[in-house]
Amino acid sequence: MRFRSSSHSLKHVDRELKELINSSENANKCGECGNFYPTWCSVNLGVFLCGRCASVHRKVFGSRDDDAFSNVKSLSMDRWTREDIDELVSLGGNKGNARFWNPKNVPFPFDGDDDKAIVEHYIRDKYILGKFRYDEIKPEDFGSRMDDFDGESDRFDERNRSRSRSRSHSFYKGGHNRSDYGGSRDSFQSSGSRYSRQLAELKDMGFGDTNKNLDALSSAHGNINRAIDYLEKSSSSRNSVSAAATTSTPPLPRRRATTSGPQPAIFDGTNVITPDFTSNSASFVQAKPAVFDGTLQQYYDPATGMIYVDQQQYAMAMQQQQQQQQQLAVAQAQAQAQAQAQAQVQAQAQAQAQAQAQAQQIQMQQLQMQQQQQAPLSFQQMSQGGNLPQGYFYTQ
């Protein structure tokens, strides 16, 4: 049995995986919570994951015995194959996952960083209960369990892998094998009659190759939206492959000979110039200090196949994030203090208004009492002087 385990193919797979992470569809983010620098990926669901969301995927899907599963793989520790990359591309990455599993655009819970149980409910509602979709979840939406490899054994031994892949891989590669249509012309014709309406719609949309359209519909199980994604990804992939074939790649610099084999290329923050480099270079240009622009760079060692992260840049990124959180906390505290001050001013104004109203009421009462006391006195004075008003008379 022949295995695709040469260093040349692994280099291409790792490079394509790195480019896929930083593409516009994924933006180097976790497809669930949106955190930067994902370190895991669910291959069959087509979504990159951070460490927290990857552990939630294992917890939610690990104890199930039905058709729902998540094939979670590490980006640096597990071994990736061409089929894994093709499946991720065909599913559309984080954006494709959101379109298929969350068309209602339900946001990730804000309290997910504090309570992991909320994240579990979110993942369960999204993939198990299908609350974020308009249609029901089907078993074929999760793909085939034959693609779900054990991550630990996959890091060291590729012989346990199944060579049977989904038809989305065969379509993405551009090959149209007769076995993809059931192995006979009758099966091909039955699929064409079953998807006749979808084929007509694809043809009206400009996809004129009937064989490719039928292959895409068979891979998508009749879902026309996924079939369109397959067709678009296939076209863009062939264009990128042809463009890459026409451009030549510059050779890598030579490594110094070592007796103990290749070592991990970990950046320690120093600028070291080897003697081989100085002897082979006609002119030496003084290196300038690196300026941190806020983005975290990942480094790939082709000898070991491992991906490293500059610890100094990682610390600076974490420091910037902490400063932003502190500034946000200070702004919230200031806003709260201003709100309290305004509330106190309003309370004082209301108290003053009530006091003024009470004072006016007391003055009105005193004025009424004075008027009542003055009325009998004026009547008595008029009677003593003999000048009574018309209609009044003396009685004895």
From Swiss-Prot:
GO terms for molecular function: DNA-binding transcription factor binding; GTPase activator activity; zinc ion binding. One of its GO terms (cellular component) is actin cortical patch. Pfam families: ArfGap, UBA. Residues 14-141 form the Arf-GAP domain. A zinc finger (C4-type) spans 30-53. GO terms for biological process: endocytosis; negative regulation of phosphatidylinositol biosynthetic process; positive regulation of transcription by RNA polymerase II; regulation of transcription by RNA polymerase II. The modification Phosphoserine is found at S153, S184, S187, S240. This is Protein GTS1. It comes from Saccharomyces cerevisiae (strain ATCC 204508 / S288c). The gene is GTS1.
